[in-house]
């Protein structure tokens, strides 16, 4: 039931609740709702600095998570294609994600056409 409530949430820049989320907000919300884990909000970006903030967020992941090999439910998925970083959360072997304006959150297969790195959230990060 919790997962079904997370699917179909509309896109909203800086959104952090069921009324709307961006990719970072979806990771924060879904981590808490599905796994009881707290993810710090490191995605304070705007149109003019998205790339810079996304790069910094990748570095900040080490503050509360560890890179892992392979797929694990509850892990943050960092997808990189060209110079763009995108975030999602692994749920039931797929990625819960939202892509951008006019989109809604959905489950996707783990992509194979660009680099994906997975991070396990440390319990003490809470």
Region locations from a protein language model:
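N-terminal capping segments
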Residues: 1-63, 82-85, 122-125
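A broad, low-specificity signal marking well-ordered, structured residues that form hydrophobic/aromatic
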Residues: 9, 93, 116
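...with weaker cross-activation on analogous glycine-rich loops/strands in unrelated enzymes
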Residues: 42-111
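Short, Lys/Arg-rich amphipathic alpha-helical interaction segments
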Residues: 104-126
């Amino acid at each position: 039931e919790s997962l079904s409530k997370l699917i179909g949430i509309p896109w909203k820049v800086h959104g952090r609740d069921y009324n709307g989320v961006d990719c970072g907000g979806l990771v924060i919300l879904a981590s808490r709702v599905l796994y009881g884990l707290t993810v710090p909000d490191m995605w304070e970006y705007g149109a003019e600095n998205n790339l810079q903030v996304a790069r910094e967020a990748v570095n900040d992941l080490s503050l509360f998570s560890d890179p892992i090999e392979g797929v694990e439910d509850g892990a943050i998925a960092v997808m990189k294609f060209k110079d763009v970083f995108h975030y999602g959360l692994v749920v039931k072997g797929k990625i819960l994600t939202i892509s951008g304006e006019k989109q809604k959150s959905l489950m996707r297969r783990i992509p194979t056409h660009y680099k994906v790195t997975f991070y396990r959230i440390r319990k003490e990060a809470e």
